[in-house]
Curated annotation (Swiss-Prot):
Lineage, uppermost ranks: Eukaryota, Metazoa, Ecdysozoa, Arthropoda, Chelicerata
Tissue expression remark: Expressed by the venom gland.
Domain notes: The presence of a 'disulfide through disulfide knot' structurally defines this protein as a knottin.
Propeptide residue interval(s): 21-56
Species per Swiss-Prot/TrEMBL record: Cyriopagopus hainanus
Top-level taxon of the source organism: Eukaryota
Described function: Putative ion channel inhibitor.
The protein, known as: Hainantoxin-XV.2
Length: 117
């Protein structure tokens, strides 16, 4: 009976996470602003002058970066590590929400199994 309750609860959590990510994407698309609508139009014009007409692309995983915005993917972060006294920042995939949910489910099942013994 407890196992059924855990399975149902985990399925509900997965459904909630999936629906919230869809809602966030829809919200972001609705609130997307054009350059003319932003107040920092001057900054965008300076960026255009520096980069020229070439398109900006994201940095792939395990390559150097400066901040999270440069890395490809939703769950990829610019993480710092120290090597020989120097700080190196690399884009790393942190797994996202799904990985955390699955890890939580795995821990819950193992705790239930250990309680039965």
């Amino acid at each position: 009976m407890k196992l059924c309750a855990v399975i149902i609860a985990s399925l509900l959590v997965c459904a909630a996470v999936a629906s919230s990510s869809d809602n966030q994407k829809e919200f972001a698309q609705e609130k997307e602003m054009t350059r003319e609508e932003t107040q920092s139009l001057g900054e965008h014009e300076k960026d255009d002058e520096v980069t020229g007409s070439e398109e900006r692309s994201c940095i792939e995983e395990w390559k150097t970066c400066e901040n999270d915005c440069e890395c490809c993917g939703m769950s990829t972060l610019c993480a710092a590590s120290w090597v020989d006294g120097h700080q190196i920042k690399l884009c790393r995939n942190e797994g996202g929400k799904l990985k955390k949910v699955l890890h939580f489910i795995q821990k819950s099942v193992s705790k239930i199994k250990s309680c039965k013994k």
